[in-house]
Amino acid sequence: MSSSIGIDLGTTYSCVGVWQNDRVEIIANDQGNRTTPSYVAFNETERLIGDAAKNQVAMNPTNTIFDAKRLIGRKFSDPVIQSDMKHWPFKVIAKEGDKPHLQVEFKGEVKTFSPEEVSSMVLLKMKETAEAYLGKTINNAVITVPAYFNDSQRQATKDAGAIAKLNVQRIINEPTAAAIAYGLEKKSQGERNILIFDLGGGTFDVSLLTIEDGVFEVKATAGDTHLGGEDFDNRLVNHFVDEFKRKHKKDLMTNQRALRRLRTACERAKRTLSSSAQASIEIDSLFEGIDFYTSITRARFEELCADLFRGCLDPVDKVLKDSKLDKKTIHEIVLVGGSTRIPKVQQLLQDHFNGKELNKSINPDEAVAYGAAVQAAILSNEGGAKVADILLLDVAPLSMGLETAGGVMTTLIPRNTTIPCKKNQTFSTYSDNQTGVLVQVYEGERAMTRDNNLLGKFELTNIPPAPRGVPQIEVTFDIDANGILNVSAEDKSTGNKHKITITNDKGRLTAEQIEKMVKDAEMFKAQDEAQREVVESKNKLENYAYTVRSTIKDDKIAAKLSKEDRKTVEEKSDEAINWLHANDSATKEEYEKAMKDLEAVCSPIISKVYGQQGGENPGNFSGAKTTEEDLD
């Protein structure tokens, strides 16, 4: 059994797998679901993660956070974030410069969390799901990210793992992980060109790989880190908001709860339209007492999302062009991600490849976690012979380079270069007697740096004065297996060296911030545990009170008790039930004391009955064990 897990940290749902008994086991959560909503909610008494958080979202929309993956590693001023904020019921604010933070009310206080912290809570839930199944503590994990995630987003995801106290052995790309799920059993077919089309809840990747004898080599990757099922939901929401306005002259945008109920109905309708030609929406008392009953056809849905669906083909063309392969040479087109169930997406893709049959052999929701679990087993040397000869050769999704005179982007590592990789180039000074150079590192494909993404900068100083062009400054770019960049610069004449892992310019968390967040996470976990114990002791008391009350109402049992005893039990159990209703937020100790007091009175009386029957004394038949159904 592997001691390392594979986690697919998704925009809308997450999934965890482990290598066990020579195969991957996808692990179900405490609700029995194999995928867990990437939701975290805060209320007056507790923090909820996963299904519990998503289930209460309509009641608590402003304090229920989702889509952290759409925020992670991005700037607050990013137009994408600004546009998303129109759809989010929770509050996003700028902190520490231009970094987005999420603001919620928790236990009556205003709290802010970074996207890394929220993601770490989801990771923690996946870690606990695996630990409950495996019966041991898990410290190591492989976490997946969209292939088109940039350096900042990868680093931030790694930080989220650290906050969840996970040693992130590797960050791997989602389509590459899915390719492992597809190719693990297919080792003897010679070289095959595979196109992975991965359209999920919030991100979209296309990767082209060749697979041969266990070697998975990515040739090219492209995508959109901001396209997925949620965008299709948004189109439906906007459509119905307009319809409601037309019919009832009222604006749903003014009410977050109504909007959330509508969004949930839209998501359900979208899923229905994958198998039916029409879906109905029925929401009672949606807004100001108005019931909203309507329907939508598949054709109308396809029209609403037409530009988004068509846009899915652009990255397909890009990877074909970058890998210099013709459509005809693609052996398999493999579908991954829940949104690939949409018939129109399948039809457009199939038409694009002249009617070629699409490969639907892998589970679109679980394939990524499956591949991550295989990689986790390999990195822990626990996969055995079955995975021994698997080799992953992935690529850098974006070109990396630095700014040279005139704001020109000089690329050191072109996009789709196999990683890990190292490239160096020698530069010189721009003016006479220049004693320092500013090294500014960018990623992107545009000719001028102003159109690309600044990753970070540093200064190399103390260069001996010399005419321009004389000093030799060697800059080295080193991308590790996680796709994260390290840069160093060295003045060859003095040996003066400056090395950085691209850090704070891109809003990365410092080691101190991560340390504080780890402590906070431990505190929240302890609070969660304490809250669970309170609920358990409350339920225990409630169960006991109701059980003894119903016991004495049983005619057979009542006949064996004196009137006084019956009255005592009835009064005491009613008293306990009334106390429970009046003290909804009592402490664990108070519930336990009330339980003790009630037992002290009722147990001896109930024992008399069982004593007369010659049966076993049920004693603490507070015994009604707390079942799942008892938990609100």
Curated annotation (Swiss-Prot):
<feature type="region of interest" description="Disordered">
    <location>
        <begin position="609"/>
        <end position="632"/>
    </location>
</feature>
<keyword id="KW-0143">Chaperone</keyword>
<dbReference type="Pfam" id="PF00012">
    <property type="entry name" value="HSP70"/>
</dbReference>
<dbReference type="GO" id="GO:0031072">
    <property type="term" value="F:heat shock protein binding"/>
</dbReference>
<dbReference type="GO" id="GO:0016887">
    <property type="term" value="F:ATP hydrolysis activity"/>
</dbReference>
<dbReference type="GO" id="GO:0051085">
    <property type="term" value="P:chaperone cofactor-dependent protein refolding"/>
</dbReference>
<dbReference type="GO" id="GO:0009617">
    <property type="term" value="P:response to bacterium"/>
</dbReference>
<dbReference type="GO" id="GO:0005813">
    <property type="term" value="C:centrosome"/>
</dbReference>
<dbReference type="GO" id="GO:0005737">
    <property type="term" value="C:cytoplasm"/>
</dbReference>
<keyword id="KW-0067">ATP-binding</keyword>
<dbReference type="GO" id="GO:0045335">
    <property type="term" value="C:phagocytic vesicle"/>
</dbReference>
<keyword id="KW-0206">Cytoskeleton</keyword>
<dbReference type="InterPro" id="IPR029048">
    <property type="entry name" value="HSP70_C_sf"/>
</dbReference>
<protein>
    <recommendedName>
        <fullName>Heat shock cognate 70 kDa protein 2</fullName>
    </recommendedName>
</protein>
<dbReference type="InterPro" id="IPR018181">
    <property type="entry name" value="Heat_shock_70_CS"/>
</dbReference>
<dbReference type="InterPro" id="IPR029047">
    <property type="entry name" value="HSP70_peptide-bd_sf"/>
</dbReference>
<keyword id="KW-0547">Nucleotide-binding</keyword>
<dbReference type="GO" id="GO:0005811">
    <property type="term" value="C:lipid droplet"/>
</dbReference>
<keyword id="KW-0963">Cytoplasm</keyword>
<dbReference type="GO" id="GO:0005524">
    <property type="term" value="F:ATP binding"/>
</dbReference>
<dbReference type="GO" id="GO:0140662">
    <property type="term" value="F:ATP-dependent protein folding chaperone"/>
</dbReference>
<dbReference type="InterPro" id="IPR043129">
    <property type="entry name" value="ATPase_NBD"/>
</dbReference>
<comment type="similarity">
    <text>Belongs to the heat shock protein 70 family.</text>
</comment>
<keyword id="KW-0346">Stress response</keyword>
<dbReference type="GO" id="GO:0042026">
    <property type="term" value="P:protein refolding"/>
</dbReference>
<dbReference type="GO" id="GO:0044183">
    <property type="term" value="F:protein folding chaperone"/>
</dbReference>
<dbReference type="InterPro" id="IPR013126">
    <property type="entry name" value="Hsp_70_fam"/>
</dbReference>
<comment type="function">
    <text>May function in protein folding and assembly, and disassembly of protein complexes.</text>
</comment>
